[in-house]
């Protein structure tokens, strides 16, 4: 076959990506340039991280056979990372689930039974009985759902409606609680609105990049390629990388900083002090657009109330703050001197000064990037607030090339978990369940009785685990997540509740994950392009894709499962009489009729789909379900700074960044000339706050919940690797990716290994106060911890590192700190 120059370039791009991971070019990638005329191509966002790369999906004879970077996608511009090139293979693992499985003994459900194939009707029969029993005997607080930042937008919206409006339970939370909750609360406290003000276009205009707890080289490799290009093409561009251990992003760093865990709070306050002491405040910006507040301190660690650390806290969980003067703020940060900071963090003084100078230099455009190092932190909200302080002091915000940017880890942690409001405390478009006006807006739009949505915040992720263990949460449905592997403190706080005979656990998943195997009922689930979907990425870009193949066997999408299950409940079975009396016309109706088959949702006919276009859910129901749900959801944000474009526009575009007003997307929010909500002459307006001003918070250093001591003498940090995504439930089923990194290892400093008579390749028992795992010693390679710290990825189901981690959370965001606990090592 003769190759065009473009095809040749594509083939080389595939080969280069594979070589980067030490792999040979797979047949699926070679299909990019082979037999193109026999392959049908369509666009989709990548299934993996929150970058939101665009890919072209090749289908042939009802299967996904190829994938390539979409050259028209503005995020990745035709390039994929190694995971992206192997997307087709995640769908065809040998153990793909194709029918519901229920634990049974002697022909009926039994908690100790074996998984047995059943029909969907049988599965829903059992679920219906369990839900109705729990609702009748103990009320809405006895049921719960754990969802995902991998849900499509309409799946998350449908789930939120079912639980908050249908079952009247706010006990629904996404796995984004474990990764982005601190970012959400940080945004809301400082700006009054969620999500970044900038976009990826900043990369090509920035003079300096500062990574705070973000290994972008492995976790956001496509963005890292753009940063690398910017750095290597411009000699005046600087890269600083801060972490508790050395990783691949350090290879590009001009200033690579290793600091003692938790002491990033000290560094952030030191930089603020440096800016003030060197008269580097942007006085015009600061005086017009900023307020100062002092936050409550000694707020605890989000542990059970009986824990000694919670009992000792003076202000457990307090989000309080009070106004303060500039002089008081200046005095507050003045304590964080260069000498004190160097002593507390272990960072050399010259490196600290170099870092501070980047922010203080008025001629340098600076972008701050962060991910889990900041967010998975018992003071993660504070860390977010403190980095905003630096940009607000200097006015380096909401303009091309400079600003703070919280990166996301999941493809729709922003678009679904945050914007839709699938958290236990949220509603669409930054509204919250505790606000009566917000509840009223939702109830009127959904045409349900006033008072239907509970005012009480539901159980967050870690609280759900505790409630299951305590027998207070009895029916639990998880979708699109593998929390038995990904969540903290498995032995003490998660597994006991899942296996408690009082509780019934449902897991919807394409594969038999650790979570699925611990459940009572497994529902086989369609994935990615086996359904029509939409994701929202880290730069506020909403992207759609069409269903391109059908799911295997009886696997069904999460959306189908939610909508069909809602048919099993009539309003009289879930709502009290006083609610029904307010809307008697809803008596006798099913939740399906009340929530999904409404005049507003069902008004878009199936005929809007192309004749040959797959859409299993809509064709079965007789109306364009996805469009109806999206347009209803989008109504909440339009006119309120969260404007989404009309549904059809997204199928034509490679994503659009909200707010989309008059057909135009927004690259930079809050600044005049860029944001349609900022009027001429206002300059900047942080319109999430009533007075249009952002907040600088005075917040101190406070120690970690657990630190090394004489017995447990090492810090443990957990995270990911390039080749695998999260718990590896998809990537470990790709043979090439599995071979590239087949099992987790314990990265350790050579001197720490030597002191314990350990050598590279030895088996080692890693022990915390909560559990133990056996791993393999690695003293070389990509991750190089300092003495006193070990690092272990969590993708390996055979090495459940979260048996070791502590379920301490940020008390404000309820996000778990997976980066800091104490362990000891024992040679095996």
From Swiss-Prot:
Binds 1 [4Fe-4S] cluster. Binds 1 molybdenum-bis(molybdopterin guanine dinucleotide) (Mo-bis-MGD) cofactor per subunit. GO terms for molecular function: 4 iron, 4 sulfur cluster binding; electron transfer activity; iron ion binding; molybdenum ion binding; molybdopterin cofactor binding; nitrate reductase (cytochrome) activity. Residues 39-95 form the 4Fe-4S Mo/W bis-MGD-type domain. It holds the Pfam family Molybdop_Fe4S4. Its EC number is 1.9.6.1. SUPFAM superfamilies: ADC-like, Formate dehydrogenase/DMSO reductase, domains 1-3. Mo-bis(molybdopterin guanine dinucleotide) binds at residues 83, 150, 175, 179, 212-219, 243-247, 262-264, 372, 376, 482, 508-509, 531, 558, 718-727, 802, 819. Predicted to be exported by the Tat system. The position of the signal peptide cleavage has not been experimentally proven. It comes from the Bacteria. GO terms for cellular component: membrane; nitrate reductase complex; periplasmic space. It catalyses: 2 Fe(II)-[cytochrome] + nitrate + 2 H(+) = 2 Fe(III)-[cytochrome] + nitrite + H2O. It is an enzyme of class 1 (oxidoreductase). Residues 1-31 form the signal peptide. InterPro entries: Asp_de-COase-like_dom_sf (IPR009010), CT_Nitrate-R-NapA-like (IPR041957), MoPterin_dinucl-bd_dom (IPR006657), Mopterin_OxRdtase (IPR006656), Mopterin_OxRdtase_4Fe-4S_dom (IPR006963), MopterinOxRdtase_cofactor_BS (IPR027467), Periplasm_NO3_reductase_lsu (IPR010051), Prok_molybdopt-oxidoreductase (IPR050123). It is found in: Periplasm. Substrate binds at residue 794. Its cofactor is [4Fe-4S] cluster; Mo-bis(molybdopterin guanine dinucleotide). Its main location: periplasm. Keywords: 4Fe-4S, Electron transport, Iron, Iron-sulfur, Metal-binding, Molybdenum, Nitrate assimilation, Oxidoreductase, Periplasm, Signal, Transport. [4Fe-4S] cluster binds at residues 46, 49, 53, 81. Catalytic subunit of the periplasmic nitrate reductase complex NapAB. Receives electrons from NapB and catalyzes the reduction of nitrate to nitrite. HAMAP family: Nitrate_reduct_NapA. Belongs to the prokaryotic molybdopterin-containing oxidoreductase family. NasA/NapA/NarB subfamily. Component of the periplasmic nitrate reductase NapAB complex composed of NapA and NapB. This is Periplasmic nitrate reductase. The lineage of its organism: Bacteria, Pseudomonadati, Pseudomonadota, Gammaproteobacteria, Enterobacterales. The gene is napA.
């Amino acid at each position: 076959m003769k190759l065009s120059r473009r095809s040749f370039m594509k083939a080389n791009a595939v080969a280069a990506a594979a070589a980067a991971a030490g792999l040979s070019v797979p047949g699926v990638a070679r299909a990019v340039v082979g037999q193109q005329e026999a392959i049908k191509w369509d666009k989709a966002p990548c299934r993996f991280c929150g970058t939101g790369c665009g890919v072209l999906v090749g289908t042939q004879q009802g299967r996904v056979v190829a994938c390539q970077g979409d050259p028209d996608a503005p995020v990745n511009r035709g390039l994929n990372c190694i995971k992206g090139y192997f997307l087709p293979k995640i769908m065809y693992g040998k153990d793909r689930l194709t029918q519901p499985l229920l634990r049974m003994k002697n022909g009926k459900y039994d908690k100790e039974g074996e998984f047995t194939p059943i029909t969907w009707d049988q599965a829903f029969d059992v679920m219906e009985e369990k839900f109705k029993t729990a609702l009748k005997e103990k009320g809405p607080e006895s049921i719960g759902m754990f969802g995902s930042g991998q849900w499509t937008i309409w799946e998350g919206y449908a789930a939120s409606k079912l639980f908050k409006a249908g079952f009247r339970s706010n006990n629904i939370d996404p796995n984004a609680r474990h990764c982005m909750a601190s970012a959400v609360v940080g945004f809301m406290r400082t700006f009054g609105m969620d999500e970044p003000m900038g976009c990826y276009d900043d990369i090509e205009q920035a003079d300096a990049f500062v990574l705070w707890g973000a290994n972008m080289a492995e976790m956001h490799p496509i963005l890292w390629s753009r940063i690398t290009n910017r750095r290597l093409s411009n000699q005046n561009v600087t890269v600083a990388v801060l972490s508790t251990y050395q990783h691949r992003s350090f290879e590009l760093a001009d200033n690579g900083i290793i600091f003692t865990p938790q002491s990033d709070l000290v560094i952030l306050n030191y930089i603020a002090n440096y800016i003030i002491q060197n008269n580097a405040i942007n006085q015009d910006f600061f005086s017009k657009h900023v307020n100062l507040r002092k936050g409550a301190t000694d707020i605890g660690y989000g542990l059970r109330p009986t824990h000694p650390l919670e009992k000792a806290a003076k202000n457990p969980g307090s989000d309080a703050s009070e106004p303060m003067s500039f002089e008081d703020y200046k005095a507050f940060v003045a304590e964080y001197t260069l000498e004190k900071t160097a002593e507390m963090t272990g960072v050399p003084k010259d490196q600290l000064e170099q870092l501070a100078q980047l922010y203080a230099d008025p001629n340098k455009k600076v972008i701050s990037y962060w991910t889990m190092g900041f967010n998975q932190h018992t003071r993660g909200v504070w860390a977010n607030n403190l980095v905003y302080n630096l940009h607000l002091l200097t006015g380096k915000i909401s303009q091309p090339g400079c600003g703070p940017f919280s990166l996301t880890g999941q493809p729709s942690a922003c678009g679904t978990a945050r914007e839709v409001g699938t958290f236990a405390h949220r509603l669409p478009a930054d509204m919250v369940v505790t606000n009566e006006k917000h509840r009223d807006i939702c109830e009127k739009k959904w045409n349900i009785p006033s008072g239907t949505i509970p005012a009480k915040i539901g159980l967050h992720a870690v609280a759900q685990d505790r409630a299951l263990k305590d027998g207070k949460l009895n029916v639990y449905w998880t979708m699109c997540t593998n929390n038995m592997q990904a969540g903290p403190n498995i032995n003490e706080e998660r597994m006991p509740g899942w296996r408690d005979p009082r509780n019934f656990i449902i897991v919807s998943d394409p594969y038999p994950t650790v979570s699925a195997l611990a459940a009572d009922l497994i529902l086989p689930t369609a994935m990615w392009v086996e359904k029509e979907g939409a994701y929202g990425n880290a730069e506020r870009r909403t992207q759609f894709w069409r269903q391109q193949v059908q799911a295997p066997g009886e696997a069904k999408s999460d959306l189908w499962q939610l909508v069909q299950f809602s048919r099993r409940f009539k309003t009289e079975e879930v709502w009290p009489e006083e609610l029904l009396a307010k809307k008697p016309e809803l008596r006798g109706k099913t939740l399906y009729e009340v929530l999904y088959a409404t005049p507003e949702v069902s008004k878009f006919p199936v005929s809007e789909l192309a004749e040959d276009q797959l859409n299993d859910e809509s064709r079965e129901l007789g109306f364009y379900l996805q469009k109806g749900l999206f347009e209803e959801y989008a109504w909440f944000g339009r006119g309120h700074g969260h404007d989404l474009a009309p549904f059809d526009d997204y199928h034509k575009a490679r994503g659009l960044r909200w707010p989309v007003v008059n057909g135009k997307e927004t690259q930079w929010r809050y600044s005049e000339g860029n944001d349609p909500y900022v009027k001429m002459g206002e300059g900047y307006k942080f319109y999430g706050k009533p007075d249009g001003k952002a907040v600088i918070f005075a917040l101190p250093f406070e120690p970690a919940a657990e630190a090394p001591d004489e017995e447990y003498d090492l810090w443990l940090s957990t995270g990911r690797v390039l080749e695998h995504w999260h718990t590896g439930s998809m990537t470990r089923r790709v043979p090439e990716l599995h071979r590239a990194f087949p099992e987790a290892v314990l990265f350790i400093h050579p001197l720490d290994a030597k002191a314990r008579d350990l050598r590279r390749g030895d088996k080692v028992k890693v022990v915390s106060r909560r559990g133990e795992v056996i791993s393999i010693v690695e003293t070389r390679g990509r991750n190089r911890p300092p003495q006193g710290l070990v690092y272990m990825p969590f993708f390996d189901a055979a090495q459940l590192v979260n048996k070791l981690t502590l379920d301490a959370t940020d008390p404000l965001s309820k996000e778990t700190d997976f980066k800091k606990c104490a362990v000891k090592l024992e040679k095996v």
